[in-house]
């Protein structure tokens, strides 16, 4: 298929959605009566859900209403009336208004730095400064400014986080020097399944329907169980809480051959809410060498759909939701001798879907019940074809183990009961967690294996004085394959003075091997990888210290933080080269990481924000009990980002820079640990976005990887069982240009 046809195919979907959006906009965009428009005096942006009171001067009782998300409310008074407009964080406005009069009201901000609300690890939704855990929040505004289309693009320039690239297995995340197999990925509190080589492919997490992302670094095993030794990444999806009907469409193009489209519609009526969205992401592949048939970045096509229905009552909220993901990845093989007219091509199809039901109860006396049940399915199928490049005919290879389907099914049930009253000295949370995972496929020993993990947990929050909080917690686990230890943690928060907070925690962590690490058997012409039923479970100790200071003065806000950590993990599981080209999952007896992070941000309301960060992470390891871990080997990274919003033209300029220092790498080869490193490199992204038609349309453009960083020399460590040998590592596909178009239209009562 030609490049021009690909463009028409991808953008044709969006133009259909654009016509629907324009129809909605033309029907509801132009008011036919007098309206009051409430805007922020500094930002010149609408103030949504402001409280408006109309009261007749001569007679009549007060009438109350709320502005729409566009900051509008109809003026339907019959006589001259007093109008009062109020909203949290703004000075109350008073005036008089006549029948049929349209009025623009400028509210004066009284608070310039509103605190974010977080839910990860909390008894109930809390402001971020009240959380006993240090939480990093990546807002929807930041996602839009970076023009990130998936989780890999979003996290690669975060301080202290490292994103690694593999052509077939995708991208993986490292936190505090610990690999992605120790990072728990959640979507609205439910674990995502479908890891490859222990890591979750970040390219498979799209951001089209994401409200914000909450990241906690450090063990959260008491609350979230296995795979949470390094931390938790919780993806919070959007919900339409205001408009009767909302239609949106997005299209994204990147010059390397990326074409992404997404369309969604949501509605609210009385207490009922509906949402349905779907899209297609396409990447045509990229190779550093035009003469090579083997592509450095594999072509892929993704389809995804998600939807939900919710009922919100005075006490209870009930939500049914589901999502579907389908990816096709093509791994082109090398030309075969002797005529070099044929090749073996492999197609990897990944299908993942989840269905879930959530029930939340807000009870009297600040008590909360949350229940969730979910079923998730993951299937990855590999089909290999022998292709004749002269006739373009291909035939399925039916011999050996070159074809396979591996499946994982997961059943999850979770419930919590919490008491969280800020006026009380004692609060608590108790809950249960049920996880049952089944793996199937020819590469699984016996073609079917099942692991069950059943746990109960409790934590207590004690505030002896208003400035001091302690939160001990414990988790009791029964695992069908392993004798699990008692997992416990103690966290503390001390407000030393106003705006200066110290957080300290000690945590135990626990991770059981997954089905693939235990029972995988994968042998073909280029792979010889085996699971290990004798693996021991990982156990960890973690100490975290965080100091945060912030100061709000008028329109300016300044924040500084520092974070130190130490991790000691027994029996960390890695893929090791045990003999020749044979690889097996084994336990690395001792593994330690330590380091610190420094960060600062300064903003001047409403236009300017600057952030800078620095992280130092050290790693040490030993293969057996008698071998010392040796000295820590450290890596450094530095980040700098800034944005400026020009109010009148609604134009935003942003840049994102990261320096990644010399990074140590460890590999186990036949009971010996070999070390190496990846050379330092720099990346820089620049974006420019502008809103049109009262923010119904937004156009973004920019340059990604301005320094054209591609491959970086790697010394001392081979590429491993899933990639070809090389003395370099792929970082990015180079400098690219992008264009993004977003349309959103809303109808209100």
Q: Model-flagged regions — what are they?
A:
Residues 39-43, 50-57, 82-90, 100-144, ...:
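Short, acidic, small-residue-rich periplasmic hinge/interaction motif at the N-terminus
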Residues 74-76, 163, 190-217, 532:
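Short acidic/polar hinge/loop motifs at secondary-structure boundaries
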Residues 101-106, 151-154, 171-174, 186, ...:
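N-terminal periplasmic accessory domains that precede
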Residues 135, 152-194:
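Extracytoplasmic beta-strand/coil segments of soluble accessory domains associated
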Residues 283-304, 315-369, 375-409:
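Flexible loop and strand-edge segments within Gram-negative outer membrane beta-barrel domains
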Residues 286, 510-511, 610, 661-666, ...:
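C-terminal beta-signal and adjacent terminal beta-strands/loops
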Residues 342-362, 495, 501, 508-568, ...:
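Outer-membrane beta-barrel signature, preferentially recognizing the C-terminal barrel domain
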Residues 465, 560, 564-568, 587-668, ...:
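Gram-negative outer-membrane beta-barrel transporters
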